[in-house]
Every structure is written in structure tokens, then in C-alpha cells.
Amino acid sequence: MTTHDRVRLQLQALEALLREHQHWRNDEPQPHQFNSTQPFFMDTMEPLEWLQWVLIPRMHDLLDNKQPLPGAFAVAPYYEMALATDHPQRALILAELEKLDALFADDAS
């Protein structure tokens, strides 16, 4: 299985987790919310919105078009800080993000 395949499976697992716990939204953010220059669109989106509307679709776009994946990639550290310590699915979300990050660490070595 290629790195692209493993990344796709992990993105699907992350999406399934967000859907299972009702963190997947049907209402798309306003167009101006995608114009952020901040990492993770901190100034225009909530952390889980960014996963749904930015990270997951952009990564799928790279995969679908057989483009190179980012060399340096780590989102879990941001989510360790961004998700409230009492968020009910914090540990589950962080675990899935750490698995995603590990795929890029493995690919870099």
C-alpha cells in the first residue's frame, strides 16, 4: 500500500469519526472564511471546521490528482492546544490526527 493510499484511508477514518460524533457540518462556511492568511484559518474557522472544509478536501485533491504530498506535516500539535481539554472527543480526534501525522513522518524517513 502506498503512502497516498494510507493517507486516503486515514482521512476517511478522520471524516468517519467527525461524522459519528456529529462534528461534520452541512452548512459550508461563507466564502470570505476561506481567505484567511492565518495557519489553520484560526481567525475565520473553528478547528474542526478547518479539518472538514480545508484539510480533508485539499488532501483528497492532492491524492486524486496524484500530486506530491507535503513533506513537513503535523496538525496534531495544534489540535492539542486548540481543542478544549474537556472536549468529549478530544482524545479520539487527537489519536486520528497523530496517525495522520505519523504517515508523513514515516514518508520523510
Swiss-Prot record:
Example GO BP: single-species biofilm formation
Cystine pairings recorded for this chain: none
Highest taxon listed in the record's lineage: Bacteria
Family designation: To the N-terminal of E.carotovora exoenzyme regulation regulon ORF1. The C-terminal part is colinear with YqcB. To H.influenzae HI_1436.
Name the record gives this protein: Uncharacterized protein YqcC
Organism the protein comes from: Escherichia coli (strain K12)
Lineage, highest ranks first: Bacteria, Pseudomonadati, Pseudomonadota, Gammaproteobacteria, Enterobacterales
Gene name tied to this protein: yqcC
